Amino acid sequence: MAAWARRDSGEKKVGKNPTDRGKPGTKTSLLVDEQGGPLGAVIDGANVPDCKLLEATIAAIVVERPTPTRQSPQHLCLDKGYDNPTGQQAAASGGHTPHIRRIGEEKKACDRKRGHKPRRWVVERTLAWLSKCRALLVRYDKHARNYLGLIQLACATYWYRRLCRLCNQPVLG
């Protein structure tokens, strides 16, 4: 027995109907800093390739960042899914220097230097933390703007708790 939701129940940010062989569901594209703090989030259907969401994700950054210069360029670490002209062009248009590594390359390069751990898990860890929020684990919202708002609220909660932890203050609520 299979269960699926009609396509119109999630507006245009849900993948195709499962009977159309498209992957159903919602994909969250998240941009984080080096410690896993969320900087920008975008949602779309799960059947949309990651490289097509990169430009919108970069545009969704909510913090002001310094203008990239030759002396201090802005770096963007990406996985192999972005190693194509679309992904590289989106990174360059955002003023970032893309660093794209295959799955094994990062571990091999870091094995030589003690104290340098691979950074591929940072985004996955943040997505795992966001999935602890019950409203984000299973999408109950019909409208995409409501679901994106819940993601942004969870990201704001992350930053609030991080600030309280850095200032040695108790977390309220």
Question: Where are the model-predicted features located?
Answer:
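Residue-level signal for inorganic ion chemistry
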Residues: 54, 79, 153
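Short conserved beta-strand segments at catalytic cores or DNA/RNA-binding microdomains
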Residues: 26-38, 47, 54-57
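Conserved, well-structured core segments
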Residues: 27-30, 40, 128, 138, ...
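Short loop/turn motifs at secondary-structure junctions and domain boundaries
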Residues: 20-23
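Helix-centered, glycine/charged polyanion-binding patches within enzymatic domains
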Residues: 66-144
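Active-site beta-loop-alpha junctions of metal-dependent nucleic acid enzymes
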Residues: 42-67
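C-terminal domain-tail junction helix/linker
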Residues: 149-173
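Active-site- or DNA-interface-adjacent structural scaffold in DNA-acting proteins
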Residues: 1-18, 32-34
